[in-house]
């Protein structure tokens, strides 16, 4: 069984220590009552993977691990087959001992768009909400973060993360918990909170923004990446049954409306730093994700529209700050 005790020990003497009042019981309940029908199969694939210590590890420019001596053909094939038991791989890519996991999304492209606008991540404690398999957490560590904590209730993502971690020498600087943000208490302890590709899946987007704010320490930075539409501060698309074949898309605001929402929730220094149309080069079917992808969700006659007739996916990145309090300012002045 995937073990979270290392994480509990890690946060016991940190600003996250009060999380231990609820977290172990939540994880234990998940292990007893909420396991996916294929979870044991996925977990066995992780267990059968060797724990490898990289001779060369690059998390700054990619997620790449290499050994001093290449794996034998048989050893590499065995590792690759175990990793393929965890398909589909959606977020990446990863290059692990000569095995290139070509994921559905080029998440490295998103990271390259976001990174120039971030405050220095050196020494920061970070929360990544809806972190998927954890690709961006490894890039956060590569950029100098002290600790990256991801939450995502999708259990396949947890097993993918644990598989990658095992092949990175059981690196303890990143951790993934199988929870949704609504299960977190107001920790107010993270220096940076990322929410990328989550907001449009929330039935109440303003509640989500408040939940993100509740996780930030005073003065902390929010990095919000989400679908948007063109328009002014009053523009919000509410799709019908589906958007780009996704059923669970509720609200897609304009970037200007989203900026106003953040300000309404009490964030300051709100700025739109990037907007980019998602291309079929960035999200596509691969050997590691063989089902439908973006090309199947766009109008074949007009790729500026989804198959339902809505504007094609446009994603914006917004950076915002949680205000300092008198108490936090006094503490920093000491």
From Swiss-Prot:
Keyword set includes tRNA processing: yes
GO biological process: tRNA wobble uridine modification
A GO term for molecular function: methyltransferase activity
Catalytic activity: carboxy-S-adenosyl-L-methionine + 5-hydroxyuridine(34) in tRNA = 5-carboxymethoxyuridine(34) in tRNA + S-adenosyl-L-homocysteine + H(+)
Top-rank EC class of the record's enzyme: transferase
Keywords: Transferase, tRNA processing
EC numbers: 2.5.1.-
This protein's record includes keyword tRNA processing: yes
Source organism, top-level taxon: Bacteria
List of residues binding carboxy-S-adenosyl-L-methionine: 91, 105, 110, 130, 152-154, 181-182, 196, 200, 315
Subunit structure: Homotetramer.
Family, per entry: Belongs to the class I-like SAM-binding methyltransferase superfamily. CmoB family.
Task of the protein: Catalyzes carboxymethyl transfer from carboxy-S-adenosyl-L-methionine (Cx-SAM) to 5-hydroxyuridine (ho5U) to form 5-carboxymethoxyuridine (cmo5U) at position 34 in tRNAs.
Protein name per the record: tRNA U34 carboxymethyltransferase
Organism per entry: Klebsiella pneumoniae (strain 342)
């Amino acid at each position: 069984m995937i073990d979270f005790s290392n994480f509990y020990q890690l946060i016991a003497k940190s600003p996250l220590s009060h999380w231990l009042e609820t977290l172990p019981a939540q994880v234990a309940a998940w292990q007893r009552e909420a396991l996916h029908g294929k979870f044991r199969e996925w977990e066995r694939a992780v267990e059968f993977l060797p724990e490898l210590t990289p001779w060369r590890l690059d998390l700054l420019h990619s997620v790449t691990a290499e050994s001093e001596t290449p794996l034998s053909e048989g050893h590499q094939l065995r590792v690759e087959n175990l990793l393929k038991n965890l398909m589909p791989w959606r977020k990446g890519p990863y290059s692990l001992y000569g095995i290139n996991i070509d994921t559905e999304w080029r998440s490295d492209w998103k990271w390259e768009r976001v990174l120039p606008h971030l405050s220095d991540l050196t020494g920061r404690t970070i929360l990544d909400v809806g972190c998927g398999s954890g690709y961006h957490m490894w890039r956060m560590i590569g950029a100098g973060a002290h600790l990256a904590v991801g939450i995502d209730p999708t259990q396949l993502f947890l097993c993918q993360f644990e598989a990658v971690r095992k092949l990175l020498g059981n690196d303890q600087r990143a951790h993934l918990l199988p929870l949704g943000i609504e299960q977190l208490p107001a920790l107010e302890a993270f220096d940076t909170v990322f929410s990328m590709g989550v907001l449009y899946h929330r039935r109440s987007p303003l509640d989500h923004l408040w939940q993100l704010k509740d996780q930030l320490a005073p003065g902390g930075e929010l990095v919000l990446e989400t679908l948007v539409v063109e328009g002014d501060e009053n523009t919000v698309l509410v799709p019908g049954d589906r958007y780009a074949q996704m059923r669970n898309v509720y609200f897609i605001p304009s970037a200007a409306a989203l900026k106003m929402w953040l300000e309404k929730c009490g964030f300051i220094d709100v700025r739109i730093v990037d907007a980019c149309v998602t291309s079929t080069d960035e999200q596509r079917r691969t050997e590691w994700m063989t089902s439908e992808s973006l090309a199947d969700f766009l109008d074949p006659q007009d790729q500026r529209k989804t198959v339902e007739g809505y504007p094609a996916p446009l994603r914006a990145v917004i950076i915002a700050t949680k205000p300092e309090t008198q108490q936090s300012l006094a503490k920093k002045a000491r």
